[in-house]
Amino acid sequence: PARAALADAVAATAWTLKRPEARGIDPERVFVGGMSAGAWLAAMTGMDRSYLAAYGIDSRKLAGLLLVSGQMTTHFQLKIDLHYPQSQFEPVIDRYAPLGHLSPELPPILLVTGESGLDMPGGPEENALMAAGLAALGHPLVRCFHIAGADHGGAFDRCEPFLTDFIAEASEARR
């Protein structure tokens, strides 16, 4: 199911970006995002360039990735589906991990999580590692926020100001 969900996310993004004039959208202003498993799907869609390239789309053209409480290692559901020997929260960084696709050429990236110990186990730390890795590689626009007192769902409930500010910042940076 996780690989099928990823294929669906990529196909939906490609559909949105194909013939943008017919859909009334500016392809330069498309952000891809999600929460929890949706953040993993969005990250993989935008970070592993091969997925959108299969549709003739350069993922670097996305306006940004908006990732809320996402798993930046290989998603635990995919590990179950593919019979990985690792436990649910044991980190795996392979071709199915956003952390395995770090590059300074990625679109702008926002990472928002709940507080460590309240959000998913290891989630805030995985997101911090991704932000640090991208910054070390010279990525021009990555932001990472951990919302104090927020659990996994609470991060979503309280992420709107971070999303709004980041979209404005990323849009301004593209000009």
Describe the predicted segments one by one.
Residues P27, R60, P104, A136-H139:
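Short, well-ordered coil/turn elements that cap or connect secondary structure elements
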Residues I25, G117-D119, A148-A150:
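Active-site rim elements
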Residues P1-A7:
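Cap/lid segment of the alpha/beta-hydrolase catalytic domain
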Residues V30, I109, V142:
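Short, conserved active-site loop motifs that form the nucleotide-linked donor/cofactor pocket
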Residues A11-I80, I93-D94:
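Primarily recognizes the serine-hydrolase "nucleophile elbow" in alpha/beta-hydrolase
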Residues P1, A53, L118-P121, G153-G154:
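A generic structural signal for short coil/turn motifs at secondary-structure boundaries
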Residues V112, P124, A128-A131, A135-R175:
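C-terminal catalytic histidine-bearing segment of alpha/beta-hydrolase fold enzymes
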Residues G56-L78, F89-A128, A132:
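The feature captures the conserved acid-bearing segment of alpha/beta-hydrolase catalytic domains
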